[in-house]
Amino acid sequence: MAEPVRKPPPAPSDYDAESIKVLKGLDAVRKRPGMYIGDTDDGSGLHHMVYEVVDNAIDEALAGYAKEVLVRLNPDGSCTVRDDGRGIPTDIHKGEGVSAAEVIMTQLHAGGKFDQNSYKVSGGLHGVGVSVVNALSSWLKLTIWRDGQEHFMEFHDGDAVAPLAVVGAARDKRGTEVTFLPSTKTFTMTEFDFATLEHRLRELAFLNSGVTIVLSDMRHAVEKREELRYEGGVEEFVKYLDRNKTALIPQPIIMKAERDNMVVECALWWNDGYHETVLCFTNNIPQRDGGTHLAGFRGALTRQVTGYAESSGVARKEKVALTGDDCREGLTAVLSVKVPDPKFSSQTKEKLVSSEVRPVVEGVINDMLKSWLEEHPSEAKIVVGKVIQAAAAREAARKAREMTRKSALGITSLPGKLADCQEKDPAKSELFIVEGDSAGGSAKQGRNREFQAVLPLRGKILNVERARMDKMLSSEQIGTLITALGTGIGTDEFAIDKLRYHKIIIMTDADVDGAHIRTLLLTFFYRQMRELIDRGYLYIAQPPLYKIARGKSEQYLKDERALEDYLIDTGLEETTLRLSSGEVLAGNDLRKLVEDSRQIRNLLRGLHSRYNRQVVEQAAIMSVLNREIFGDPQKAVAAVPYIAKRLDALSEETERGWQGRFAEGDGFLFERMVRGVKEVAALDQALLGSADARRLDEFAPELQKVFPRPTPPAMLKRKDEEISIHGPVSLFEAVTAAGRKGVALQRYKGLGEMNPSQLWETTLDTNARTMLQVSVKEIDEANTIFDELMGDKVEPRRLFIEEHALAASVDV
């Protein structure tokens, strides 16, 4: 088991105001936030805000002072990060004349990371510190437990509301807590994604063995919580990555050493698959593009494995020449280096360029892997056997390619199925990979021949997750696809500059078979031509799901949301809503109410199944879906009979009799007897404190105006028809039902159901179509998904289906 890297320095007191070095202020951050925190539109910059604060806590752990980090997503949209480290220094900074805590929060590049005495190595994705988080937050609250006292400070838009103040005794607490709300002035999206945060925090937990990281999501009625703690470090990380694969040797190979003031940790494990997964980190920061540490690792690995194969006589016996690619087939590895002053190719630190790191990594891997191979001959023989099999398959694939070149369907001639375009510039050319000959025929007739090519593929293509290169090249569909693209395949052959199209568009049916074929194609491109994805060349077509016909007019709708929009538009024609007060809503006022009702319907749909949505809806109208209700029990008790009365008005006469009560600390409980069976509906503290309840509560003033009492109800009038409306959900359903009258709705399952002109109008026309661009955010997560869905093991696939079955929406 790998030992933690942390060694507490002897004098914790050295970390004080004197350690804080100031470089410059924060104005530039607000003007160009993307330079400091990443993209402010796609969510990456938003999550980097959390990582910046977490990195400070992890730095405390690396220095040996913190053991637990808590990250909590709050119902109001804010995020709290807390650690049990030393606490940010609170004494006065001599150079600035204010507390060191205020300096750290308001000055760019201020912190202990610039003082080697405070932190030997430190993380931080952009190296800009928590001050940027403060600058880009609507508000930030800082609590510090240090030297027996609790200190508090608040900031609005990056500026201190008041100086740091002592608000009480720390008792047995120590550490720092930062709670911040991202500013809507900077970020177009301010909702944190649990899975994104979990992925990064899990990495940090693996890389810092012994540190506990707790991620908690309090935004919903049921708390979601993950406790991440891994004593095994990089060894356990590799086991986690390979959890769905069959290992070739019993345990991963662990290598760890400290040289030239750098720490190198590496774990590697071979499995029976055909793909390489190597994750690289410098000071806990991931390098997606590798760098000098990866180059050192690969050089040493190739040298030692091929050297052992030669010296043991196995390679000579099999008469094969081994390459680095052969050595890395089926390899999963995690390489982590701790470097005092690393240099990267860009601000986002995607590639390490510190030249001094390569010889250190190469030396450690050379020495320790050589020893392991000599000390474990039986396991080494298995590894070398796998490498030789890879070399033999590579040689067979090379011969298959040679045969292909000499055949009639060689590289020089394009497949007969391909309907090519006239344009020869790849940047202006598109290739549609279409499922089946019928859809292929429509696409060929409907396309713009000038720049759009069509390649129909019949049947399901080979699952490349379970196939070596030689088997892959024997597949007719794969061969046709490779030839059409023009790039070749394999490490030695693949040439991105020979790609004939810079838009490769997967176009399959909207049924189960179409989804399967799309997944098989994505597997092929991800495993064999990932550079196409990295360069943004791969897309998925989004043909419409619906065709609407009303009278002589026809319209195509791409998804359920577009269908709802259409039904609302038609349902509101000649429609009014008369409230119990006598006021009549129509036009834009009624449209806004229906749009709000749709939001409420969606929020109610998202609630846990244990909650009665009708009861929650009526409670929302009465404005009791908030935690403040616990502070005003009198109001809560008074609301109970009104909610019960409203529920009776919604029920059939034989199913009435709702009764309720409110208990402080618990919430509301409503019940009724239906055919001798008691039905119970609870609105507990978890629901009342959730973000969903908070959002529903925001609609209360509007809902109380529209639905002030259960009787008489509001009346929706359309032409000669009147419908009773008791709440927002019934309003939305009545309007969309009205919109369906006189409308012929056709749902497309297959592309072959469209004629060429329809396919052009909806899916091929560059001015009208919608496409999804394929990208990979987290390589290890993508590997896991392909392992689970396309790999040999059935159990992970079964568990995946069980977990996600209810969320699936596919046509059989």
PLM segments and residue spans:
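Conserved phosphate-chemistry cores used by DNA topoisomerases
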Residues: M1-V812
